[in-house]
Amino acid sequence: MAGNRSTDIKVHCSFCGKSQDEVKKIIAGNNVFICNECVLLSQEIIKEELAEEVLADLTEVPKPKELLDVLNQYVVGQDRAKRALAVAVYNHYKRISFSESRDEEEVELQKSNILMIGPTGSGKTFLAQTLAKSLNVPFAIADATSLTEAGYVGEDVENILLKLIQAADYNVERAERGIIYVDEIDKIAKKGENVSITRDVSGEGVQQALLKIIEGTVASVPPQGGRKHPNQEMIQIDTKNILFIVGGAFDGIEEIVKQRLGEKIIGFGQNSRKIDEDASYMQEIISDDIQKFGLIPEFIGRLPVVAALEQLNIDDLIQILTVPKNALVKQYQALLSYDGVELSFDQDALEAIAAKAIERKTGARGLRSIIEETMLDIMFEIPSQEDVVKVRITKESVNGDAKPILETA
């Protein structure tokens, strides 16, 4: 507590030696005293050291091949997209680590944010999560459909930054090197190429608001979220080194690509390549197609890296179920092993699960719910049936035509 100035005994700070008369407050500990000035100084020292630790971590960024190896352990397929992401992420953090020591005369490297285009359940969110985890940087996910421009009911774009700050345990320096994934970005596309005379609360206005933080600015973030209020204390965060990955399904964009490629054939006649109807038009997307879909040119310009993900087929989904380190089949096998039960899936059972996910158009994200439906009764009964040692999931049990096969001791 503060020293009493009315006594004859003068208390001095154990660190700087100043007396209680020379400072505003002295705090007493166990045979030690510290003044308010030394408290502030120590806070600054700790802050600087933490910032240096963050920068030190970034000097050891995994190379693109190493990042790809990590992604391959957890993500099935999407090889082109994974390579594009690995290169973009490596270049981003290399840019940060070298910009701190860059001379003014040297070339200034601009930030390369990423746009991922692919159908629902193709792995967009999981790819971003896996990258952030492998780099040990803060990560936040936001849904573009919940955002509105300032002055309208909804969530301010600055609240995206608050999620990242919270993921960094309110360490702003660490958050400034984090990754933000904004999903459903295609849902804030303009509803056509003609500019509407009415206010576009959730479309172009949100793109403009996102543009500011994506390209790099010092933003003021309410520490408790919500709308900003006058005289409210704010957290200042510089977004110039935050990597933004945005993703969306962009349903219908392949028709825009087909139209563009078809027009090219008409324009150049037989010298132009013939469009293969079975080809993946998603790999042919260019910025003009994205603009025609409804994203504004300025926004597209801040997303120079475009990674197109393909629709997952049955074989891809079966691999997702069984191959990765954290594959769903392995997870459920581990769950039942805690009860002393061995779990197995027939090959045609895996095919049935994958077929259901494709039928429901949920892709990889729908696999868990299908397994849960199949195994609900088993997971309810097994803990009480101590004589059961094996459970076998068949195609019939996945389709609801029979129960899983149990084997007892």
UniProtKB/Swiss-Prot annotation:
Protein name (database record): ATP-dependent Clp protease ATP-binding subunit ClpX
Binding sites annotated in the UniProt record for ATP: 119-126
Subunit structure: Component of the ClpX-ClpP complex. Forms a hexameric ring that, in the presence of ATP, binds to fourteen ClpP subunits assembled into a disk-like structure with a central cavity, resembling the structure of eukaryotic proteasomes.
Keyword list, A-Z: ATP-binding, Chaperone, Metal-binding, Nucleotide-binding, Zinc
ClpX-type ZB domain sequence ranges: 1-54
Binding site for Zn(2+): 13, 16, 35, 38
Name of the coding gene: clpX
Function: ATP-dependent specificity component of the Clp protease. It directs the protease to specific substrates. Can perform chaperone functions in the absence of ClpP.
GO biological process: cell division; proteolysis involved in protein catabolic process
